[in-house]
């Protein structure tokens, strides 16, 4: 069997790096790519706009990586980093924790932590400028059916995308070695000893 790499998006999950034979696609919104050959293998409702929830955090992470000069710079977790996080998944950081930006990025991607998102946003561009940068980056990539209204993925009529646009984003982002390393990591221990585990649904062979 020939191994291909693909990414599949439904409402809240994606998977990649599987064999092309005998896969079962049940997602409502799907873009299936062979990344080795840059070929679209299958699509379903791939240009239909939909709420993207935590998939928003892929763009959040990409923008952060492009904006932060030193990922090993120390950041102190503050109370403001937990504002608006009730009901959302968190990485597990606590007020007063001293961690690196790198730790926070793993906290965003692996456990989909809203606390990590807020800490990054608050310590870099600030909320409004960060959202503006997310939308500017989307346009640069060619995500013409995408709009970001927040960096966490909260329900908002102005926070949406398509599986086709998200495929463009992931394809672009994986060219960044830092993003690729974080995105493909399953487990990570932060500099202050917090163990993070990926919640991404994967199919890997």
Model-based region annotation:
Residues 2-20:
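Sec-dependent N-terminal signal peptides of Gram-positive bacterial secreted proteins and lipoproteins
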Residues 13-14, 56-59, 99, 198-201:
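Short amphipathic alpha-helical surface micro-motifs
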Residues 167-205:
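Extracytoplasmic
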Residues 20-164, 168-177:
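Active-site-adjacent loops and short helices of periplasmic peptidoglycan-processing enzymes
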